[in-house]
């Protein structure tokens, strides 16, 4: 008599314990959002000003899909994906989807639908900057993430549900 290790299930062509493999994968629902993660020439509450074109090199190198969508800048809380990031005449326009694949994602979806979460904030490394009085002008940045936040450092950086 063969004994199975505890907690493990037999896998066959029919799936796990006879269930079809397709039942192991579920479709996730998403909530489409868009807005401005950064605005050209506007000082944030920390005295940073992003110059027009500051994200161009980073986005050309990585694309929007490599920039993470986080909740409140928490690296462990990836809550969705960014589908588009475009530098336009106003700033960095972003469009993406908050996914329901985690508790944080579902929470962010609910808050966004209710209008309680609508801020955006960028996580980056400055590649080139200059000082203008008390302000730091970011000329080129390496964009790592755009977070959905309660209180953005740039008060005008907001998103809405599509």
State the predicted function of each range.
Residues 7, 18-20, 35, 78-81, ...:
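Glycine-centered structural positions embedded in regular secondary structure
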